[in-house]
Amino acid sequence: MYSVLKQSIRPRLLATHNQFRTMITAQAVLYTQHGEPKDVLFTQSFEIDDDNLAPNEVIVKTLGSPVNPSDINQIQGVYPSKPAKTTGFGTTEPAAPCGNEGLFEVIKVGSNVSSLEAGDWVIPSHVNFGTWRTHALGNDDDFIKLPNPAQSKANGKPNGLTINQGATISVNPLTAYLMLTHYVKLTPGKDWFIQNGGTSAVGKYASQIGKLLNFNSISVIRDRPNLDEVVASLKELGATQVITEDQNNSREFGPTIKEWIKQSGGEAKLALNCVGGKSSTGIARKLNNNGLMLTYGGMSFQPVTIPTSLYIFKNFTSAGFWVTELLKNNKELKTSTLNQIIAWYEEGKLTDAKSIETLYDGTKPLHELYQDGVANSKDGKQLITY
């Protein structure tokens, strides 16, 4: 369990030998008890002393932080990884900060900090950071540096990161990339992966990354009135083939998929499951011998059910994938993966999943903006910007 960043709670005005100086007044969204976000969140003001930084300390201001399903689950108390509660924000009762993903700008560094400087963009280096806030105080190793747009331009890159790309870089793109590269060796130009949830954020990243790595892919999506339009958009992103859930579950359609795979001279080696239920059974059946299915979500709330014959006669393997667990003790892997995603963004080769952005301008309590984000999350990913 990671502890939250330190907070410097002191009077707003401090007397020095010859003058008064002001403090940074910050705000954070907290909760003292688990429950529904609409019931338990509140905004807490706290102060950061920017004139008395320890040598390794860094002050950052928030540029943007999204509302993720895992954030909601943490507040509800049903997520395995939870932030520690603390009185460091100035609360009477111990309280936990909300949010795991976010993009920050460095505004001041301590005397021993050489890896960061004012103006740098950073993201948290570990989970349970507490990103639903206006500012944070931490040590330099609490952050991973990303290139800001000016730095990308100075390095000759055609594109700089957007706030949305930076604020949402550490979960969905990394999940897609690591599932495709960390477990199974897919032969470029030949081998296939199949995924359900093809229109989800991770699904779209997987289609794009698969194309960039020259992997063939099949994306499974639900039937819908504008099916042809959605299929065309997913193929434009990078999906080799797109099928419906009915086709995924149809034994009659199976030979068509086998023919696709046969024509490439490869095998279907990997399945990515975020749905469960019949959908997961269907994509598991498409794999060749020794195939692996990674489950990283369960949107249908139905159990993953695999026929016994797949285990016995095809040596099928089913495993879970949790990007938090994989990366929590492996900063090097996280950094190298981030660098690849950043390079694709800078080169214009990867399109980010768009968010619905809401600007925090101080006219509404901060926690209410995130409560609105939770309530509206079914309409798309919500991003609070500053």
From Swiss-Prot:
It catalyses: a 2,3-saturated acyl-[ACP] + NADP(+) = a (2E)-enoyl-[ACP] + NADPH + H(+); (2E,4E)-hexadienoyl-CoA + NADPH + H(+) = (4E)-hexenoyl-CoA + NADP(+); (2E)-hexenoyl-CoA + NADPH + H(+) = hexanoyl-CoA + NADP(+). Residues 1-22 form a transit peptide. NADP(+) binds at residues 172, 199-202, 222-224, 296-299, 321-323, 381. One of its GO terms (cellular component) is mitochondrion. Pfam families: ADH_N, ADH_zinc_N. It is an enzyme of class 1 (oxidoreductase). It is found in: Mitochondrion. Catalyzes the NADPH-dependent reduction of trans-2-enoyl thioesters in mitochondrial fatty acid synthesis (fatty acid synthesis type II). Fatty acid chain elongation in mitochondria uses acyl carrier protein (ACP) as an acyl group carrier, but the enzyme accepts both ACP and CoA thioesters as substrates in vitro. Required for respiration and the maintenance of the mitochondrial compartment. Homodimer and heterodimer with ETR2. Belongs to the zinc-containing alcohol dehydrogenase family. Quinone oxidoreductase subfamily. This is Enoyl-[acyl-carrier-protein] reductase 1, mitochondrial. It comes from Candida tropicalis.
